Each structure stands twice: as C-alpha cells, then as structure tokens.
Amino acid sequence: MELASGTTLVAPQPKGILDPATGKPIGSNDAFFGEINNELADKGFLVTSTDELITWARTGSLMWMTFGLACCAVEMMQMSMPRYDAERFGFAPRASPRQSDVMIVAGTLTNKMAPALRKVYDQMPEPRYVISMGSCANGGGYYHYSYSVVRGCDRVVPVDIYVPGCPPTAEALLYGVLLLQKKIRRTGTIER
C-alpha cells in the first residue's frame, strides 16, 4: 500500500452491527477495509470480521434436539435419514439440550408437558433457536379447542421458524432448517 507522505489510514468507528438497507455489517465497504482487503487478497488471505466468521461457523454447525410429541416426529425422523441427509447442511442431532443449538417442537403440546418444554429450553446454551413443526405445535392444530392443549408452543418458548402442515413433509422441515440458517446469517450471533 502506498500512502502519501504524512497521511495515515485510520479505521472508522463502528456504527452498529448491520446496515438495514443492505443487511451487511456496517464498515465492511469503507475505504480502509477495501484497501486492506485488496492488498491481502492478492497474497491469498481472506479478510473478514469476527462476527461474520462466528456466524458462518454457527450456520454450518447447528446441533438439534427433538421434542417429538406426536405424529410430526415421524417426518422429523425421516428428515434425518440418508434420503434427505440433513447433516450435509451442518444440521446434526444431539441427545442432550446442553449440546444443542436448535430445538424442534413437533406435535401437540399439552398443558402438562409445557413446563417440561420450558425446562428443556432453559437448559440449552445461548444462542438457542426453536423450530415449531406442524399445525399442532404452531397453533394447537386439530386439538385446538381441547381444555388440555396449549394453543401453540410460542406461548411457552420463543419460536424462530414455523413449519406449517399436518404433518409437514420432510422437505418442508428441511426448508425450515435452511430458513433458520438464513436468519442466523442475516441477524448474526454475537448480539441477538
């Protein structure tokens, strides 16, 4: 990099995490960053921000756990089998909530099961995500008017992705996983 005598490059102060217009980190297209990136790209280096690096790693290594309550769990099992192979997207199953980033709630959530769902959700490390799968988990489904059914798991835990259907297909659930990865890329993982 050639600089005129007496001039120095100073990185601008960060103004926030994401630019609302472009969805990219603010400051990634400034002159200082551009010159360093051009200089190092010729030498085989990649210049990025820490937030982008962590977000990239997190989207490619989502560990999920099941909270299968009814027939939607069969489609969830089908998604993890070799035909759809969700692990090629970095979406691997785990048995413990302490090792999981994503919880898939599939099926009818009853009032008696709601505290257990919240307890398992609280045991998951931050950042944690929830996919609500099927009509019963989304809003009570066929049993919506029953006295013992919670009308949607979003009344107990915050839901990030809703997958509609009764039961939704394995392709729909896989599409929901891809939407979750897209959401993580868009929002970042350091501050949520």
Swiss-Prot record:
InterPro entries assigned: NADH_UbQ_OxRdtase-like_20kDa, NADH_UQ_OxRdtase_20Kd_su
Cofactor stoichiometry and binding remark: Binds 1 [4Fe-4S] cluster.
UniProt catalytic activity: a quinone + NADH + 5 H(+)(in) = a quinol + NAD(+) + 4 H(+)(out)
Topology in the lipid bilayer: Peripheral membrane protein
Enzyme Commission code: 7.1.1.-
A GO MF term: 4 iron, 4 sulfur cluster binding
KW Acyltransferase (keyword) present: no
Keyword Metal-binding attributed: yes
A single GO cellular-component term on record: respiratory chain complex I
Ligand binding ([4Fe-4S] cluster): C71, C72, C136, C166
Keywords: 4Fe-4S, Cell inner membrane, Cell membrane, Iron, Iron-sulfur, Membrane, Metal-binding, NAD, Quinone, Translocase, Transport, Ubiquinone
Top-rank taxon, per record: Bacteria
Pfam families: Oxidored_q6
Record localization: Cell inner membrane
First-level EC class: translocase
GO BP annotations listed: aerobic respiration; electron transport coupled proton transport
Stored HAMAP family: NDH1_NuoB (MF_01356)
Quaternary structure annotation from Swiss-Prot or TrEMBL: NDH-1 is composed of 14 different subunits. Subunits NuoB, C, D, E, F, and G constitute the peripheral sector of the complex.
Protein name as it appears in the record: NADH-quinone oxidoreductase subunit B
Lineage, highest ranks first: Bacteria, Pseudomonadati, Pseudomonadota, Alphaproteobacteria, Hyphomicrobiales
